[in-house]
Swiss-Prot record:
Keyword annotations: Late protein, Repeat
Upper classification of the organism: Viruses, Varidnaviria, Bamfordvirae, Nucleocytoviricota, Pokkesviricetes
Signal peptide annotation: none
Similarity-based family: Belongs to the asfivirus I196L family.
Originating species: African swine fever virus (strain Badajoz 1971 Vero-adapted)
Protein name, per record: Late protein I196L
Amino acid sequence: MLFRYLVWLFRFIEVKNVVSISLLVIGSNYLTTAISNNTSTTISPTTSSNYLLTAISNNTSTTILPTTTSSNYLTSAIPNIISDKEDDTPFSTDKTVSDGLSPITLYRAIRSTLNDTMTDILTRPYRPTTVIFHSDTPQPVKNATQGNIIKKTYRQVLTFFIQPNPLFPCFKNHEVFLNLANILNTILCIILIKNV
């Protein structure tokens, strides 16, 4: 289930006009895959004991905003400021967010999110935390209140997390989320996009 979730995660990374992509998978094994001249849209990273097929489609993806919570229920991480009716649009793969998030920023945000999750679990196991980030900042912005596009996408992603989905079980226990964080930390990827 967790690896199916990872497939879903990487499928929504927005990639446009890519000439060359270098994918570095951090784990027990290292694999570098290059895509040149826009002739392929499939990346297949490999870990030591599992195989993960990742498809990145041009102009059809939605940027993923990582979220983290150390409380027992993920719903507690939804701020009241983004509970407007216009933000309750169901999550759809057809919607493209024009935020222009760079892969390096995504990598830093994921790493920071995982670090915050580890710290919160060990020292403050019941304090809810939300992490979202802007494309023009090198690090995540905690409890951000500006940016309608970011808030709307954040709401959509959280809604997709909470509702039952066959891809992965609902994250209602912080231990389950921590296990996912450990897996992500093991196969954390740096995606380098050149000539975008």
